[in-house]
Structures are given as C-alpha cells and as structure tokens.
C-alpha cells in the first residue's frame, strides 16, 4: 500500500502530462504541483480538477487547461522580485500560480462575482501577495504603475497600446490574439530598447476579452 502522503493517481498523471508536453522549468512545475486546482473549480467539477482540460466557471468564463497555464507561465520567465499584471482573474487559479513565482500580482476582473470569489478564495488559501481589482482590463488606472510581466487570459483581436505601455524595460507580455470565436495564437512581446519584439507561439482557444465592467454578475 502506498504511503499516506503518496499523490493520488490523477495528480501523478497531471504532473507527468506537463513534463511530457515539454514543461521543464522546475519552479513552474513546483507551483503547478503545490497549487490545489481542485480548490478553484466548481463543486461539480472536482473529480475532473486534475484532468488536462479547461472547465467552466461562473459568468460564462473558464478555468484554463493546465498545460496552457503552465506554458504561458513558463514563457514569462518569472523572477522572485518581479511585479506581474494579470488581465482576467477568473477563478484565481492562474493568479495563484503566478503568485508563487514573483513578488506581487495585480489581477483585474470585469465580473464582480468572479472578483469577489477569487479574492476570498485566494485569501483563504494564503496567497497574500495578490491584489484582486474589479475593473476594465483595457483601461488600467495610472496609479497601478508599471509591471515586469503582463499576462492576458482572454482573447484580444489586438494587444492595446495601453497595456504595452505598462511594461517595464525588458518586460514581457503574453496574450492570446485572434478572433473572439475559434482559435487564437499566443503572442509574446518583449519591450526592447528599439521597440517591441513580437513572437508567435502556439494556437489556443480562450473566451473573448471584453471592455468595461460587467453591469450584471
């Protein structure tokens, strides 16, 4: 019989799948291992929490596929002393992963229900270097300052200059870019002295990023 602290089979497969699909950054893998995805999914989806699939949450949004979470996180090359902006809090799962790898996360959510739930969940689980804001991801207030890294977790037809202007020198931004329906492409931007360096990564499918704060929900 395995020891009491032996990971359940589904979590072992979760970890193995990330490695098989090319996730190699040990800090990212540890964060994916330590953040309990089952605490961020809907009650009825707990049995599927460790499956490599996106799951629905409130307000018609989703908690992203674990591979995509790990991939986007790895591509940001996060450091312990960095400040990160996340657009699209959702359940707070990606937020929690980021918080284990940097100094501070500011995350913006347009749905009050999701923002309130994520804030309470993250506080309960002890992720204390996170600030959850109800707001418009297309219009970040000036007092928020600039960030070393920016992650967008909803599809944009183009990356607004208002976001790239928030990047510190040598900062990185990752976002799904493309039509609101169908597939998008993950784009990685780096702020270089001569301007933005753009790199196309993998095809993905995200819910659309919408401007403004939701009047309902």
Swiss-Prot record:
Keyword S-adenosyl-L-methionine in record: yes
Catalytic machinery residues: 64
Cellular component GO terms, alphabetical: cytoplasm
Localization per record: Cytoplasm
Entries under InterPro entries matching the protein: PCMT (IPR000682), SAM-dependent_MTases_sf (IPR029063)
Principal location listed in the UniProt entry: cytoplasm
Leader sequence residues: none
Catalysis performed (reactions): [protein]-L-isoaspartate + S-adenosyl-L-methionine = [protein]-L-isoaspartate alpha-methyl ester + S-adenosyl-L-homocysteine
UniProt family annotation: Belongs to the methyltransferase superfamily. L-isoaspartyl/D-aspartyl protein methyltransferase family.
Protein name: Protein-L-isoaspartate O-methyltransferase
Organism of provenance: Nitrobacter winogradskyi (strain ATCC 25391 / DSM 10237 / CIP 104748 / NCIMB 11846 / Nb-255)
């Amino acid at each position: 019989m395995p020891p009491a602290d032996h990971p359940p089979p589904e979590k072992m497969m979760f970890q193995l799948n990330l490695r098989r699909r090319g996730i190699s950054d040990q800090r990212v893998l540890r964060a994916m291992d330590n953040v309990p995805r089952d605490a961020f999914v809907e009650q009825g989806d707990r049995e599927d929490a460790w499956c490599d699939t996106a799951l629905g949450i409130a307000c018609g949004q989703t908690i992203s596929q674990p591979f995509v979470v790990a991939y986007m996180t790895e591509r940001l090359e996060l450091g312990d002393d960095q400040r990160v902006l996340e657009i699209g809090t959702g359940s707070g799962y990606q937020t929690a992963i980021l918080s284990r790898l940097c100094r501070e996360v500011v995350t913006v959510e347009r749905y009050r229900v999701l923002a309130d739930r994520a804030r309470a969940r993250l506080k309960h689980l002890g992720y204390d270097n996170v600030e959850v804001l109800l707001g418009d991801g297309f219009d970040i207030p000036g007092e928020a300052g600039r960030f070393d890294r920016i992650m967008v977790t909803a599809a944009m037809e183009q990356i607004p200059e208002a976001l790239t202007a928030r990047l510190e020198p040598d900062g990185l931004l990752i976002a799904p870019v493309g039509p609101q329906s169908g597939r998008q492409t993950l784009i990685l931007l780096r702020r270089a002295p001569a301007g933005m360096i753009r790199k196309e990564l993998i095809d993905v499918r995200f819910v659309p990023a919408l401007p403004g704060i939701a009047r309902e929900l």
